[in-house]
Amino acid sequence: MGDEDWEAEILKPHVSSYVPVFEKDKYSSGANGDTFNRTSASSSEMEDGPSGRDHFMRSGFSSGRNLGNRDIGESSKRETTSTTGGFGRGKGFGNRGFLNNKFEEGDSSGFWKESTNDCEDTQTRSRGFSKRGGYPDGNDSEASGPFRRGGRDSEYDQDQGSQRGGGLFGSRKPAASDSGSGDTFQSRSGNARGAYKGLNEEVVTGSGKNSWKSEAEGGESSDIQGPKVTYIPPPPPEDEDSIFAHYQTGINFDKYDTILVEVSGHDAPPAILTFEEANLCQTLNNNIAKAGYTKLTPVQKYSIPIVLAGRDLMACAQTGSGKTAAFLLPILAHMMRDGITASRFKELQEPECIIVAPTRELINQIYLEARKFSFGTCVRAVVIYGGTQFGHSIRQIVQGCNILCATPGRLMDIIGKEKIGLKQVKYLVLDEADRMLDMGFGPEMKKLISCPGMPSKEQRQTLLFSATFPEEIQRLAGEFLKSNYLFVAVGQVGGACRDVQQSILQVGPVFKKRKLVEILRNIGDERPMVFVETKKKADFIATFLCQEKISTTSIHGDREQREREQALGDFRCGKCPVLVATSVAARGLDIENVQHVINFNLPSTIDEYVHRIGRTGRCGNTGRAISFFDTESDNHLAQPLVKVLSDAQQDVPAWLEEIAFSSYAPPSFSNSTRGAVFASFDTRKNFQGKNTLNTAGISSAQAPNPVDDESWD
């Protein structure tokens, strides 16, 4: 067909006799509201990446998930105009298609109208016409360029001056605005639910225009905007029994009394031995008793009086040792004593305490603890995090917010939109502070403390808690803490919990899957977590285990928040007794009865290894950690692993010692980013007092590297 014939075909009124058959549930989430189950895909699909969807090849019909931009027709450098039904103005064709499952005004194409309670954004892109078809702006009938769909390329049209961005799968660069006609074509670049760019970002998808936007950059209110994230998490249980459901302590809980604790800094207050010595109010004491707390852990004995005294604190204690209660209880005691300012009757909420953690699951866990200890008081805790509806976060805040628990991206987004005030902030808490201050979230945390209205570090109390504090992180902490802050070191700082039996197995890459199946079948009904390094690998291993008749689910940053919460729920209740995870689940998560941790892939740093195996052996319970050591990729961890195993009084394999001290292993005390010495004591040189710690662990000499393939927020 020549150019003239093609133009005439477009411009003439046309009534197609073709009636597409839409499989209503083919790409939808289903009647029950469940989203796609990633573990049900074939192993070949998980290993090779997402496959292209079948699409209609007639006059702009396509499936709900196109893969980019591709010219239809013989010429890509010619302006066309549409004035009749079918093309443009969102009527059947074009970038609008179906909007909220109903037709635009004046549409008469005869398709059904559908209503659904499913909140997922898939409903606007998986039914009806493609949003990638036709012109990019349904209100501009003069838009330049032919109808484009499919494909994966990007080109710049010199004749028309318009830029069309296609982008490969997972493209991290949004199409730039053009310098000519003002039309920007943007590719969907793969499916919408697997499209996290990086640390704090979420996908903004919509009618013909997509954009990668960070929450901190206003990703939910961009000029180029599609359907917002609509997931609203279910409310937590309100009955008292559920609120105060507590973790069962293990047989080794009493051994905490023998752990060495050192406090460095000026004029540290003495430790307390019982909750009664803290002089907390009666309501707090009642809530502590209901939660099943009878004895203080070492970090609580020293941290509670320090926080009550108003001192800044950096506390380093092993995983599962009660750090959350160590900062929540004294903060609540202060708020109960001094009174609160925020209430639901104020137009602008100004929380007194802000708690920040790197992952959604961890911050929700902290919120539940805050809700537990504040039960029956006038203090109201609120949690906000990415992957949930932005309006839902605002509604939670305006109802009253005294303690704000947040992930960094959503917190900066809320602050940027002036939904909260910071003038009343008295307490700033960074949980998993080493991760909060490293390359992943360091810039955002610096923005937070420099926000207008945020009290200076001299006017607020700042608390940093983690299981690991490398020396570089301690230096960065100087920007957040007063110069006279106190440093609490509990036990072997940066070391692994001795309640965890560690085993290192030398397993090559091709044998790992079969070895994993063998271990899982031998442990019977015990509940294991399997850690891998990448999101793709997590889904692949989960699929493989399901094929081996082992019920498995997965959690990682590319799964929608609804799916992440469902996966954790299925794992907790035993519906899926095996959880395959990336570093999203490595820090802080407190899941009862996790008896095994299996490192299918070892992490890049020893600090991350300590956090991973800390998911078991919590609160005095015993656990086991099995790690697959690959001599082709894990040699940099040989020396730090030997040190961690020795400090935890674990058996060290002879072959591992050989690798650690061979000439092929990196030197132990170097400035390399892997396997160097990390600080196991207060690194300040100018404080008055004696630091008696004389043990040195081995870890990264600098901040832990952010996990390249993981979305933390």
From Swiss-Prot:
Share what the entry says about its subunit structure, partners included: Found in a mRNP complex, at least composed of TDRD1, TDRD6, TDRD7 and DDX4. Interacts with RANBP9. Interacts with RANBP10. Interacts with PIWIL2 and MAEL. Interacts with BMAL1 and CLOCK. Interacts with Tex19.1 and, probably, Tex19.2. Interacts with RBM46.
According to the record, the residues making up region (Interaction with RANBP9) are: 213-232
Instruction: Provide the catalytic activity annotation.
Output: ATP + H2O = ADP + phosphate + H(+)
* Compartments in which it is found: Cytoplasm; Cytoplasm, Perinuclear region
Q: What is the E.C. number?
A: 3.6.4.13
Which PROSITE patterns does the annotation name? DEAD_ATP_HELICASE, HELICASE_ATP_BIND_1, HELICASE_CTER, Q_MOTIF
Species for this entry: Rattus norvegicus
Presence of the UniProt keyword Cytoplasm in the record: yes
- Which Pfam families does its entry note? DEAD (PF00270), Helicase_C (PF00271)
InterPro entries (UniProt xref): DEAD/DEAH_box_helicase_dom, Helicase_ATP-bd, Helicase_C-like, P-loop_NTPase, RNA-helicase_DEAD-box_CS, RNA_helicase_DEAD_Q_motif
Q: Where is this motif: Q motif?
A: 273-301
Q: Where is this chain compositionally biased, Polar residues type?
A: 29-44, 178-190, 689-703
Where are the stretches annotated Disordered? 23-240, 689-713
Q: What is known about the tissue distribution of this protein?
A: Testis.
User: What are the Basic and acidic residues biased-composition ranges?
Assistant: 71-80
Residues that bear Phosphoserine? S207, S211, S711
- Specify the Helicase ATP-binding domain's residue ranges: 304-487
Q: What is this protein called?
A: Probable ATP-dependent RNA helicase DDX4
EC category: hydrolase
Task: Establish whether keyword Repeat is in the entry.
Answer: yes
